[in-house]
Amino acid sequence: PEGMNVQLKVVAWYVGRVGQNFDGGNPNTSAYTLFNGVNIINYDYDWDGLAYICYYSTDDPANHPDIKVHFMNGQVNGYLSPDKTNEEMHEMCVNAPNSHMDLVGSKVHSVWSSEGLAQYCKASDGTSLGYIQYMNLLDSLVAWEHDLIGLTKYNRLPDNRTMAYVNYTYYMFQGGMGVSFHVDQESRVLNCQRLMYNDFDAIWGLSHEWGHQHQMAPWLNWAG
């Protein structure tokens, strides 16, 4: 809209360091303000990133028009979503220009390594491609949390999404952006069969860390 701006954030999810005890690399975010017209972006960070347009409002989003942003150059990484086939999404992961890939479900936006998704994202039968089922599984976990804390009952469901992402520094935690698992855990947390039937710690971890993210001080806030 005239007189307004939006943020372009380029996130390098991998920055060249892998650790195990908060001694690895954290995602690096480079932010740029976009205005109407031509914007020149000089991204000079050492590692490639994925670009996100941040268009938020504190009032009713319906009061704000849609915007269009056109990138003159740069590679298209794409994102996985339930409207694509499992075969299409597998091809995207195998041929991804970036080392990481976004998955956008109805309630969860997650980011994992492209290699891990191509290798480990299997359905509950253990062999079929599992991208659609995996996104539905994550969405179900968040929907159940919304039921548990009363957001569904009192018609307070948020219109945005919660987050999950891969990290290179610690086993499992709830970071500033959402639930995070170490890259060496992708064989567990990307596999629907393991999450649903064989690995209660992994599926508990997702739900537990999202529980922290859903804490709303001072009304719902617990320690530990």
Positions of predicted regions on the chain:
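A short linear-motif detector with a strong N-terminal bias
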Residues: 30-33, 81-82, 89-91, 142-143
